[in-house]
């Protein structure tokens, strides 16, 4: 057993292409010819005619030797005889009784093997007789094992099976799963495989029926695989049943016709299901024919689909290394030399150039074909791979191979870079471009001295764009289009809203920009004139981008710019942080000092609590403690606001702001303190302006008086100057009277935006100050009053007044926040309707 197992061989490609025959002239009469030679010539002619009748492609038939032609001819005749009997539906027909009607009907049918049906199977069809001969194998066996259909038909199946699985396969071929139990006729040994093959034939009466469940088979064994470079075997699952093989007409030793014998009809599928990508690529295995120097001379139909070249385009370019990536040339050359020495290269993975200048990973196996004992040409079988598989093979290869020019690591060894200047990753350029011309001249001269069959010459003949294409596909596109479109759109935006005397200048600039960018201002047909064959145009065409698309992109960009061009950006206006910080600090101090503000004790204002006497007493005590302090601070605030020359500082009222700002407010009786403070009339010099303002003698709760915040980052610019006291006298009584007219109805609640830069509870004072401008002029003019409308005005009117240098009117957008007073107040005067409805309440800061 050991001696026999030592000589076990597996199936391999052993075919040799037959010698091409040439028709020789018939010798003249009288000249004797060799009878044996005439016999050989006659035999070769018959074999060629027999090979032409085989149902195989012509490229397969041309590679068959004489024994293979005879073997396949016998197999074809046996298969044809089987189908002639098996396609008959009744047992009577199988015994030779034929129905004329059915025969005529079947003659009209052209029953052929469906190619799509075989591709739909996740495996291949295999029929094995009980004496271990492959009766039939479908053509899809090549996709899984790498063997041609003609390689395995009518060969021993044990040449394909792993040695450890051969006994199990033999057991599955027996109807009782016990091949050791043999009848009286004995066994014969297969010396090559070390297995006993039964030489006995069973009578159908001795075995179970054909449709019995005991005839079903499902098992796993390993088959020889030429496509697997790890172990060389592929685990396959065989699922089928034992059936009778009809129409073989075998005879026994006594010359009697034997009954049909059993055979295994099964579908072999890989034990591990292939991925979707493997299923997609398995049907694209193609073959190419090359000279000994790897110059392509032919390609099959699938190769033309994968690579995109016609056979003429593939053969006219010279060396096949021009289609190989520069980083894979030395790798392929190494296996090329190995193939010349050993006859087969083995499995290698590299990149091939397609017609659309893309690289595709392939797994190839090349072998030599001999003629008259000498190498004649090369047949390469390639299988497309995915980018992930190719990258993984490249990573494994880099761990073994030395440094190469293509990776830039040859600089470590001071080796001259063989790349042309455009492929150099670090080209040396001069300002006048002379260096580029010199290098191009040198590269042209170097090509003349290169060996035409060398790898360097093949690489120099490659187009540089195949290496630069992925990296440079977007650079020129963005540079020529997006940068210019931004400049054009910016000029267009300036032309939309010209102001003042700048119209002529801006129109001139737009005209100049259109002259400098004729590709964008004119029709798209003018883009890149006479450059339809340029690299940029080819890149755009490959990406599916046309000049119409670029025109639409520009129109879309201009459309969106038009929608937002009317909105002014208030963030461009500088904010005077110094003034706002001062106002905020002073107001916060007075708020905390006078009202005793405690956030934890805040509660909503209740009108019913305004009549409680104990709250009034508490407010009286608080006002007495801070009367003088507020008066001094209010004077400072007025002086500060005098130089602002504004009527209001914030822009938006909001009535829907969440998060109230709760701050206790003192009662409106606090304004009586000005009559008690000495020197008040001298400290508030605003008598004349306040006297001109009508008011009403009514007070309402002041819980609404807060500073309205400016909305959404609106920034205002105020002049900064020295703070000087104004020369206008005033009295505390007039100030108190003016405060009363600034009150709003109790039902209105205003909130404070937490993002506001200024927060203060000093409602009445700040309202009195900000209602009119504090201008140090001799003539006291009455300021125009505007009706309170918190929803209509917007930031545009405020900005127009600010840009034109005019007086800032009291117009604010509608944003109001709510603030609650924790201490209810009492009315000094009955709450009545405001007699002056046109008085704006936007004076509240």
From Swiss-Prot:
One Pfam family this chain carries?
Answer: HLH
Polar residues compositional bias, start-end: 1-10
**Modification after translation (UniProt):** Mono-ADP-ribosylated, leading to inhibit transcription activator activity of AHR.
Annotated motif Nuclear export signal: location in the chain?
64-72
Give the signal sequence positions: none
Q: What is its main location?
A: cytoplasm
- Region annotation (Disordered) ranges: 1-39, 820-845
Where does the bHLH domain start and stop, copy by copy?
27-80
Q: Which residues form the PAC domain?
A: 347-385
Domain PAS: from-to ranges: 110-180, 274-341
Q: Which UniProt keywords apply?
A: Activator, ADP-ribosylation, Biological rhythms, Cell cycle, Cytoplasm, DNA-binding, Nucleus, Receptor, Repeat, Repressor, Transcription, Transcription regulation
The entry lists its GO molecular-function terms as: E-box binding; Hsp90 protein binding; nuclear receptor activity; protein heterodimerization activity; RNA polymerase II-specific DNA-binding transcription factor binding; sequence-specific double-stranded DNA binding; TBP-class protein binding; TFIID-class transcription factor complex binding
Chain location of the short sequence motif Nuclear localization signal 2 per the record: 37-42
Gene Ontology, cellular component aspect: cytoplasm; cytosol; nuclear aryl hydrocarbon receptor complex; nucleus
Q: Where in the cell is it found?
A: Cytoplasm; Nucleus
- Note the superkingdom of the native organism: Eukaryota
Q: Which PROSITE patterns does the protein's record reference?
A: BHLH, PAS
Instruction: Please give a single GO biological process term from the UniProt record.
Output: negative regulation of T cell mediated immune response to tumor cell
Chain span(s) of sequence motif Nuclear localization signal 1: 13-16
Role, per record? Ligand-activated transcription factor that enables cells to adapt to changing conditions by sensing compounds from the environment, diet, microbiome and cellular metabolism, and which plays important roles in development, immunity and cancer. Upon ligand binding, translocates into the nucleus, where it heterodimerizes with ARNT and induces transcription by binding to xenobiotic response elements (XRE). Regulates a variety of biological processes, including angiogenesis, hematopoiesis, drug and lipid metabolism, cell motility and immune modulation.
Assembly with partners or alone: Homodimer. Heterodimer; efficient DNA binding requires dimerization with another bHLH protein. Interacts with ARNT; the heterodimer ARNT:AHR binds to core DNA sequence 5'-TGCGTG-3' within the dioxin response element (DRE) of target gene promoters and activates their transcription. Binds MYBBP1A. Interacts with coactivators including SRC-1, RIP140 and NOCA7, and with the corepressor SMRT. Interacts with NEDD8 and IVNS1ABP. Interacts with BMAL1. Interacts with HSP90AB1. Interacts with TIPARP; leading to mono-ADP-ribosylation of AHR and subsequent inhibition of AHR.
Q: What is this protein called?
A: Aryl hydrocarbon receptor
What species was this sequence derived from?
Delphinapterus leucas
Q: Which gene encodes it?
A: AHR
């Amino acid at each position: 057993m050991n001696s026999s197992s030592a000589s076990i061989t597996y199936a391999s490609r052993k075919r040799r292409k037959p010698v091409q025959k040439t028709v020789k002239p018939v010798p003249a009469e009288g000249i004797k010819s060799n009878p044996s030679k005439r016999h050989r010539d006659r035999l070769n002619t018959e074999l060629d005619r027999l090979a032409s009748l085989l149902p195989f492609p012509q490229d397969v038939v041309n590679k068959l030797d004489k024994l293979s032609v005879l073997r396949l001819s016998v197999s074809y005749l046996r298969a044809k005889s089987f189908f002639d009997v098996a396609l008959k539906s009744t047992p009577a027909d199988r015994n030779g009784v034929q129905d004329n009607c059915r025969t005529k009907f079947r003659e009209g049918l052209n029953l052929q093997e469906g190619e799509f049906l075989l591709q739909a199977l996740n495996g291949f069809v295999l029929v094995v007789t009980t004496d271990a001969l492959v009766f039939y194998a479908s053509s899809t066996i090549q996709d899984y094992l790498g063997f041609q259909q003609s390689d395995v038909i009518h060969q021993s199946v044990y040449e394909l099976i792993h040695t450890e699985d051969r006994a199990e396969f033999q057991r599955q071929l027996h109807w009782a799963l016990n091949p050791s139990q043999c009848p009286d006729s004995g066994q014969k040994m297969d010396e090559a495989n070390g297995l006993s093959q039964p030489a006995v034939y069973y009578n159908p009466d001795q075995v179970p029926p054909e449709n019995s469940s005991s005839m079903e088979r499902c098992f796993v064994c390993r088959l020889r695989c030429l496509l697997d470079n790890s172990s060389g075997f592929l685990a396959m699952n065989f699922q089928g049943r034992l059936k009778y093989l009809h129409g073989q007409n075998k005879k026994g030793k006594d010359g009697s016709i034997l009954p049909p014998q059993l055979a295994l009809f099964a579908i072999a599928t890989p034990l591990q299901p292939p991925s979707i990508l493997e299923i997609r690529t398995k049907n694209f295995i193609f073959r190419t024919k090359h000279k000994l120097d790897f110059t392509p001379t032919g390609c099959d139909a699938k190769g033309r689909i994968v690579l995109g070249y016609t056979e003429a385009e593939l053969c006219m370019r010279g060396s096949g290394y021009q289609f190989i990536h520069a980083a894979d040339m030395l790798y392929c050359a190494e296996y090329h030399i190995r193939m010349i020495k050993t006859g087969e290269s083995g499995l290698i993975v590299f990149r091939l150039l397609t017609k659309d200048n893309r690289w595709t990973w392939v797994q190839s196996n090349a072998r030599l074909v001999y003629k008259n004992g000498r190498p004649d040409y090369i047949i390469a079988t390639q299988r497309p791979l995915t980018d992930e598989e190719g990258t993984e093979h490249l990573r494994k290869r880099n761990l073994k191979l030395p440094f190469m020019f293509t990776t830039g690591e040859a600089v470590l060894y001071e080796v001259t870079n063989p790349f042309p200047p455009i492929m150099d990753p670090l080209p040396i350029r001069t300002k006048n471009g002379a260096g580029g011309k010199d290098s191009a001249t040198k590269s042209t001269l170097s090509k003349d001295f290169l060996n035409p069959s060398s790898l360097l010459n093949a690489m120099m003949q490659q187009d540089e764009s195949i290496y630069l294409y992925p990296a440079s596909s977007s650079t020129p596109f963005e540079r020529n289009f997006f940068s210019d479109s931004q400049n054009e759109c910016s000029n267009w935006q300036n032309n939309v809203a010209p102001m003042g005397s700048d119209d002529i200048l801006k129109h001139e600039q737009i005209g100049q920009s259109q002259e400098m960018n004729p590709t964008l201002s004119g029709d798209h047909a003018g883009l890149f004139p006479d450059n339809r064959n340029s690299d940029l145009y080819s890149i755009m065409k490959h990406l599916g981008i046309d000049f119409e698309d670029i025109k639409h992109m520009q129109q879309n960009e201009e459309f969106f710019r038009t929608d937002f061009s009317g909105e002014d950006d208030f963030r461009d206006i500088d904010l005077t942080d110094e003034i706002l910080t001062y106002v905020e600090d002073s107001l916060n101090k007075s708020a905390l000092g006078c009202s005793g503000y405690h956030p934890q004790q805040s509660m909503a204002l209740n009108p019913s609590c305004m009549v409680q006497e104990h709250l009034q007493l508490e407010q009286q005590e608080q006002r007495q403690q801070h009367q003088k302090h507020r008066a001094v601070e209010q004077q400072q605030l007025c002086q500060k606001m005098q130089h602002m020359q504004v009527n209001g500082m914030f822009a938006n009222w909001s009535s829907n702001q969440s998060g109230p700002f709760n701050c206790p407010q003192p009662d409106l009786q606090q304004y009586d303190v000005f009559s008690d403070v000495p020197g008040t009339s001298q400290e508030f010099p605003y008598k004349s302006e306040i006297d001109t303002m009508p008011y009403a003698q009514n007070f309402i709760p002041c819980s609404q008086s807060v500073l309205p915040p400016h909305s959404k980052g609106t920034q205002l610019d105020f002049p900064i100057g020295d703070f000087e006291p104004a020369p206008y006298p005033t009295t505390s009584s007039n100030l108190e009277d003016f405060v009363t007219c600034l009150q709003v109805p109790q039902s209105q609640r205003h909130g404070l935006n937490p993002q506001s830069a200024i927060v203060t509870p000093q409602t009445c004072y700040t309202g009195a100050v900000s209602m009119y401008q504090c201008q140090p002029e001799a003539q006291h003019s009455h300021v125009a009053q505007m009706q309170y409308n918190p929803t209509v005005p917007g930031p545009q009117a405020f900005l127009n007044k600010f840009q034109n240098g005019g007086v800032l009117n009291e117009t604010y957008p509608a944003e109001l926040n709510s603030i609650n007073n924790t201490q209810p107040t009492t009315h000094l005067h009955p709450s009545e309707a405001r007699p002056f409805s046109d008085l704006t309440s936007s004076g509240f800061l």
